């Protein structure tokens, strides 16, 4: 089960990995994302997509072997409700994998600190929880999850080209800032500065 499956890229890989004897299930609250996922996986017979929130998944208790959540819990208002639902769905000794970003540490560093801070502070509004990895283990323990392990994955981008994640993130942040009312000239200046 992929919680917050988006366009279905991970479900496609899971479905191919588990083969026809298994099933890859994706959930997402966005009907347009579910439509995209269904289209991407249309040639696979072992997929199921459900448009729903993570706290109310229409599946039987103890029915899934593993749950993945990639960059999802940042956007869930009530994390405990979603974790309780995931725990309900997991078979005994099944695995839950979560990957989350420490968004408060995710930033670009151009020469003008005030402008960088403005863009960083505005982008904080893009999700409900900026620092999921700092508290998730405690929540999991309180809800009865066992064998909790954390692996830190640090990454630093040293090159920025048109095909890099840094360029994608810059565009995402710029568009978000514009949607929140930051003046276009400030956003353009920020983009110009971080290109240097």
Regions found by a protein language model. Name each.
Residues 80-92:
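A short glycine-rich, Lys/Arg-flanked "PGG" loop and its adjoining helix->strand segment in the class I
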Residues 1, 7-56:
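Class I SAM-dependent methyltransferase SAM/SAH-binding core
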Residues 143, 166-196:
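C-terminal lobe and adjacent flexible extensions of AdoMet/dcAdoMet transferase-like proteins
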Residues 97-162, 176-179:
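Conserved catalytic/acceptor-binding region of the Class I
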Residues 65-78:
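A short SAM/SAH-binding and catalytic strip from SAM-dependent methyltransferases
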Residues 55-66:
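A short acidic, Gly/Pro-enriched loop at the edge of an enzyme's catalytic core
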Residues 20-21, 90-95:
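Short glycine-dipeptide loop
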